[in-house]
Amino acid sequence: MAKRLFVKTYGCQMNVYDSARMADVLAPLGYGPADHAEEADMVILNTCHIREKAAEKVFSELGRLRKLQAAKAEAGGRMILAVAGCVAQAEGEEILRRAPFVDIVLGPQTYHRLPEMVAQAARAGGAVLDTEFPAEPKFDFLPEPHAEGTSAFLSVQEGCDKFCTFCVVPYTRGAEYSRPAAAVLAEAATLAAGGVREITLLGQNVNGWHGGEGWGLGRLIRALAEVEGVERIRYTTSHPRDMDDELIRAHAELPQLMPFLHLPVQSGSDRILAAMNRGHDRDTYLRLVDKLKSACPDLALSSDFIVGFPGESDADFEASMDLIRRVGFVQTYSFKYSPRPGTPAAAMETQVPEAVKDERLAQVQALLLDQTMRFNHACVGREMRILLDRPGRHAGQLLGRSPYMQPVHVKAAAHLIGTVVPLRITKVHPNSLEAVPA
C-alpha cells in the first residue's frame, strides 16, 4: 500500500530545495505526496533557525502534530514525525526533550540517509538523532531530481565561512562547500529535460561558488546558459565580498541571466557593518552597485536589512534609510534583530529595546513599499518577456513572473504555460502586474 509524505517547509529557498530532495530520497520507499498532514504516514518539518519566533513555531506545530499522531495510532496506523533543517541541527537534543514523541531529528547535511533513519526508527521504536556533518557530501548520494513546473531551484553551494556576528548559518550548515560543475550541469540538464525553463542557483554564499581551475560562478552561469532548454537563470543569496568581475560581466553579456539581483547589505552604517563582521563598508557596497548598474543598466536590486542590531543608534538607522533611497532597492527583506544563542551579537550589552525595533522596522517597510510601488508603476508601458508558469485565479488567465520577480497576469491560452512570451505591462495591482500580448 502506498504511503503518504507531507513536508512543511520554513525559511529560505535552500530549505525549499532540501524539502523537494527529501521527497526524492523517500520516493523509493513508496512515499508519495500528501496535501495535508492529516493524510500523511510521515510528516517532516524542515525548519529555519534564523529568528527566534521561527524556532518556537516549530514546537507549536509539533504540539498539533502530536494529536494527529495519537489519533493515527488509535486507528491502528502510524505517523512518523521528523524534524529536519537548521533548528534540528542546533537544538536536536532539546527537540527530543521537549517533544519525545518525535521519531527522527536530522540536520541539513544528513537527509540523504533518511531511508536508513526510517528503518532504524521502525526497528528500535525510539528516536533517531543524526545531526553530524558527514565527510561525504550528501549530493553524491541523492537520486536524480524530480522536475515539477517550469521553475526550479538548484543547490550549488552550502555553508558559510563569513561568521557574521548575528548569524547561525556557519554553525547549522557548516563550512562552505561547492558542488562540482559537472554535477551542477548534469542536474540542470535533467531539470530542463523535465520541462524546467528557469533555474535559480542556490547557496548561502552562492557567488562564493568555485569549481577549481578558474571556475567561478560567472563561468558556471555561462556553461548553464548553454544547456538546452534553460531560458532563464537566477542566483541567490550572494555576498558583496564575493561579487567578482567575471560575474559582473555575465550580467552584462548573458540574456539568460535575469536583471534582478539579491545582494544583502544588512545595514547602511559603517559602525554597524563592522560590528556585524560583514567584511565591507558602505562605500564599498555603493561602488559595487554602481559597477553592476554600469554593466547592466536594467538591473534592479533587492536586499536584506536588520533593524535594531545591538548598539544601533538613530544615526546608524538613518544611514540605512539613506542607503535604501540611494540604491533604490525595489524589494527588501527587513527584520528586527533577533538574538541567536551562541552568536557573538547575542552577548553584546547594548541591546535595542523592542519598541524601538518595531518603530524602525515600520519605517523601513514603509519606505520599501513606496519604492516597490514606484518601480512597479514605472514598468507600465514596458515590454517584458514573461515566463508563464500556471493558471491564474480567473478563467482564461495565466500567471507568470517578470525578469524582476513580479507576478504578472495575462489573458492567454493554457497551452502557453511553460513558455516565455513578450507582454506589455498595462496595470499595477497591489501585489501583481497586469499585461497584454505585446
From Swiss-Prot:
Compartmental location: Cytoplasm
Primary localisation category: cytoplasm
Top EC class of this enzyme: transferase
Catalytic reactions of this protein: N(6)-dimethylallyladenosine(37) in tRNA + (sulfur carrier)-SH + AH2 + 2 S-adenosyl-L-methionine = 2-methylsulfanyl-N(6)-dimethylallyladenosine(37) in tRNA + (sulfur carrier)-H + 5'-deoxyadenosine + L-methionine + A + S-adenosyl-L-homocysteine + 2 H(+)
Residues annotated to bind [4Fe-4S] cluster 2: 160, 164, 167
EC numbers, comma separated: 2.8.4.3
Binding site for [4Fe-4S] cluster 1: 12, 48, 86
PROSITE patterns, A to Z: MTTASE_N, MTTASE_RADICAL, RADICAL_SAM, TRAM
A Pfam family: Radical_SAM
A cellular component annotation (GO) from this entry: cytosol
Gene3D superfamilies, sorted: Methylthiotransferase, N-terminal domain (3.40.50.12160), tm_1862 like domain (3.80.30.20)
Molecular-function annotations in GO: 4 iron, 4 sulfur cluster binding; metal ion binding; N6-isopentenyladenosine methylthiotransferase activity
Annotated ranges, domain MTTase N-terminal: 3-123
Cofactor note: Binds 2 [4Fe-4S] clusters. One cluster is coordinated with 3 cysteines and an exchangeable S-adenosyl-L-methionine.
Residue ranges of every copy of the Radical SAM core domain listed in the record: 146-374
Record keywords: 4Fe-4S, Cytoplasm, Iron, Iron-sulfur, Metal-binding, S-adenosyl-L-methionine, Transferase, tRNA processing
Residue span(s) of domain TRAM: 377-438
Cofactor: [4Fe-4S] cluster
Function recorded in the entry: Catalyzes the methylthiolation of N6-(dimethylallyl)adenosine (i(6)A), leading to the formation of 2-methylthio-N6-(dimethylallyl)adenosine (ms(2)i(6)A) at position 37 in tRNAs that read codons beginning with uridine.
Subunit description: Monomer.
NCBIfam families per record: miaB-methiolase, MiaB/RimO family radical SAM methylthiotransferase
Family: Belongs to the methylthiotransferase family. MiaB subfamily.
Name of protein: tRNA-2-methylthio-N(6)-dimethylallyladenosine synthase
